[in-house]
Amino acid sequence: MGCMAKYRVQNPKTNEIEKTYENITSDELEQALSTADETFKQWREKSYEERAEVLRKVAQLFDDKRDELARIIANEMGKAVDQGDGEVDDVVEIFNYYADNGAKFGADEEIPNERGGTSIMRKIPLGVIVGVMPWNFPYYQVARFAAPALMAGNVVMVKHANICPQSAEAIEKIFDEAGAPKGLYTNIFAGHSQISKLINDDRVQGVSLTGSEGAGRSIASQAGQALKKCVLELGGTDAYIVLDSTDIPAAAKTAWDKRIGNTGQACTSNKRMIVMEDIYDEFVDELVKIASSYTEGDPLNPEEGKFYPMSSRDAAENLVQQLKIAVEEGAKIHVGGEVTGKGAYFTPAVITD
């Protein structure tokens, strides 16, 4: 029996349901994996230039469809379209980069050894690689995973995050339109048990995950038990350090801009700010001034001084709970920290300990 869990696309601006998707069935998963495995046997024999041709077509289609792609993620996870457009820029660059450099990266390397001989390092394709992708950069993260894997002669099966199925679907359609062989890039709507099944299947040779520490531990454990190659990119706790020699208004604006991008939902965003004591109060005042000036914005019509919805209403309400715990532990909220309206808008907050 197949798992019939459903994914609902909820517009974070309005919280309205726009579309519903269902998980792939067990039979469909087997068919997808079988097709990917057969495609790998042909794709691995392609020259680097033949592989590069497909990647360049994918890059061009991303470029051609940038407005549509940016609107999809604006409606799906609240990202402002100008930021979505910037994400597409990165995707185009990544696919073209690996198309241009894949042959160099994949070339045999001759390495002199200490006995006067020569060792040869030969790079060969692995096979079917499974990618478990996050929602916060739904195109960029897929490109970082898929482009080098495909250029190296592998095929990929991508399980995207539950809240961005339209983005996932759009990527697969681009590969189809680029003339990629069926099974080269496969999008799957799948549950945890189905991903476990893939990891433990002999036809799958590797898995890559970008996500939480908990998910990483689970994937790494399963991959280790199955002796599969595993790549993990997990979260960070980046600090923004402010010295007393700084221009305080400029430093506060930079810190704010780095924190507010993608509504703060990025692993590279500064999670905390460490400020030298003699400028601490002035720096906090500057941040509060900036935060207080921001008002709700429409992700489809971005403007300076606007903040946009979180990825979902649940995500916004989770932040409220985090702030509640912080206050209980002694933190002070200077401004913001509330969910407003029907959607997933969370007023920008400044808290200190």
Regions found by a protein language model. Name each.
Residues M1-G117, S293:
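N-terminal Rossmann-like NAD(P)+-binding subdomain of aldehyde/semialdehyde dehydrogenases
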Residues E50, V54, V58, L69, ...:
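Short amphipathic alpha-helical coupling segments at ligand-binding clamshell hinges
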Residues L33, L55, A70, V91-V92, ...:
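A general structural signal for well-ordered alpha-helical segments in protein cores
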